[in-house]
């Protein structure tokens, strides 16, 4: 049987930063249900790879296809643009969790998520009752959970996550592990970096040691 076309595919990818080649000749592909963990030593380009895959950086060489189309050549179809959550929460301090998630959800849905859907997402990450509190009053862990609440909103199938377990307590880590695995088990896809040892792995889990492609 000929395998289905990958939703995400990178071919002969290379990345240079500040005059140093981080990696080159990297091939990867992601199909429905896959979880790809990017590992490797500090400085090998893990975060840079994620930024390439979501279009925030351009590769030094190689090609990235998203949904069989060259990444960045034209806007992704509605609901197909990858959801990117970086190491920093990337929320606006002066806004409330409800307000932050309202505009962030609009990046992937024409009208964004409604207030009830956002409240349900905040409840899922343990922030019920904090919907209308300015984010600058929240702890680092709570701000991280505001960002991660995006994973509980309707959105695209592909998630790109940089150290998603940072600043979470044990209960938060266990809950997020479960949610990530279930996303893949229901046909979603994830590429992520993490120093956390995962205890729940979906059938499509793979590890990519980026150090093997260091220049």
From Swiss-Prot:
Query: Where, by residue number, does ATP bind?
Result: 40-47
SUPFAM superfamilies assigned to the protein according to its UniProt record, in alphabetical order: P-loop containing nucleoside triphosphate hydrolases (SSF52540)
Q: Where in the cell is it found?
A: Cell inner membrane
GO cellular component labels: plasma membrane
Which top class of enzyme applies to this chain?
A: translocase
Any one Gene Ontology BP term: cytochrome complex assembly
Keywords, alphabetical: ATP-binding, Cell inner membrane, Cell membrane, Cytochrome c-type biogenesis, Membrane, Nucleotide-binding, Translocase, Transport
- State one molecular function term (GO): ATP binding
Q: Where is the ABC transporter domain?
A: 8-215
Catalytic activity line of the entry: heme b(in) + ATP + H2O = heme b(out) + ADP + phosphate + H(+)
The record's annotation in InterPro entries points to: AAA+_ATPase, ABC_transporter-like_ATP-bd, ABC_transporter-like_CS, ABC_transptr_haem_export_CcmA, P-loop_NTPase
Q: What is its EC number?
A: 7.6.2.5
What's the protein's topology in the membrane? Peripheral membrane protein
The yes or no answer to whether the keyword Nucleotide-binding is present is yes
Family to which the UniProt record says this protein belongs: Belongs to the ABC transporter superfamily. CcmA exporter (TC 3.A.1.107) family.
What is the stated purpose of this protein? Part of the ABC transporter complex CcmAB involved in the biogenesis of c-type cytochromes; once thought to export heme, this seems not to be the case, but its exact role is uncertain. Responsible for energy coupling to the transport system.
**Can you say what this protein is called?**
Cytochrome c biogenesis ATP-binding export protein CcmA
Query: What organism is this sequence from?
Result: Pseudomonas syringae pv. syringae (strain B728a)
Q: Which gene encodes it?
A: ccmA
